[in-house]
Amino acid sequence: MERVLIVNADDFGLSKGQNYGIVEAYRNGVVTSTTALVNGEAIGHAAQLSRELPALGVGMHFVLTLGKPVSEMPGLTRDGLLGKWIWQMAEEDTLPLDEIAHELACQYQRFIDVFGREPTHLDSHHHVHMFPQIFPIVARFAAQRGIALRIDRQTVLNADDLPSDLRSTQGFSSEFYGEEITEACFLRILDASAHRGEASLEVMCHPAFVDNIIRQSAYCYPRLTELEVLTSASLKAAIAERGYRPGSFLDI
């Protein structure tokens, strides 16, 4: 059985080093797709690079934890900035859901304005779209617009709650991250997906070259390691041997 493999590089637009790393992993590696933060410092640079790579699938990386929002969000920001306090607000069930829904629409429009096209799919920075309070908003938004959505099915308690016309891969993995970034880890992800009988799989990654912005990230130098593994000729060959076809969310 032919299986579709989407290797999606998150954080397009975060910095020029991030952008160049993603492009390198696409041109000379196994990355097939990316998602962009429309409030990132290098989003214009990302859009410029993407015009030179029309086959690279570019989706939107919904942001509620970093930088300035596109719209006014007094209920979520502190001193005008987004941050990781969103986790505490989610636990306390005090999220400003109307503001979040409006910000999603505004970021979506900003994406269209910057890239000149709709995103191939949606996901989010730090997986905030998988919060139980936020997921229905984002799932409904994606379904209404006919675009795909990253879904971590391990966190969706009731698959029956998903909109019937929502598109996503059958499998998703965030395991290629952290301390064990190796070719063996990547291939274990593929083999586990194949064992589950999934016809499509998304693997999340964050390849980058280090610059001053990336140095400020708690997840800095592992991005270089990811880039090294993702551009390995042996990894590309091993993926092909397993019957996976590289694709984007337009293939789902």
UniProtKB/Swiss-Prot annotation:
Give the pathway: Glycan degradation; chitin degradation
Tell me which cofactor or cofactors this protein depends on.
Mg(2+)
Q: Where is the major localization of this protein?
A: cytoplasm
User: Which parts of the sequence bind Mg(2+)?
Assistant: 61, 125
- Catalytic activity as recorded in UniProt: N,N'-diacetylchitobiose + H2O = N-acetyl-beta-D-glucosaminyl-(1->4)-D-glucosamine + acetate; diacetylchitobiose-6'-phosphate + H2O = N'-monoacetylchitobiose-6'-phosphate + acetate
Q: Where in the cell is it found?
A: Cytoplasm
What Pfam families does the database record attribute to this sequence? YdjC
Instruction: Write out the entry's keywords from A to Z.
Output: Carbohydrate metabolism, Chitin degradation, Cytoplasm, Hydrolase, Magnesium, Metal-binding, Polysaccharide degradation
Cellular component (GO) terms are:
cytoplasm
Example of a GO MF term: chitin disaccharide deacetylase activity
Functional note: Involved in the degradation of chitin. ChbG is essential for growth on the acetylated chitooligosaccharides chitobiose and chitotriose but is dispensable for growth on cellobiose and chitosan dimer, the deacetylated form of chitobiose. Deacetylation of chitobiose-6-P and chitotriose-6-P is necessary for both the activation of the chb promoter by the regulatory protein ChbR and the hydrolysis of phosphorylated beta-glucosides by the phospho-beta-glucosidase ChbF.
Q: What is this protein called?
A: Chitooligosaccharide deacetylase
The record lists the organism as Salmonella schwarzengrund (strain CVM19633)
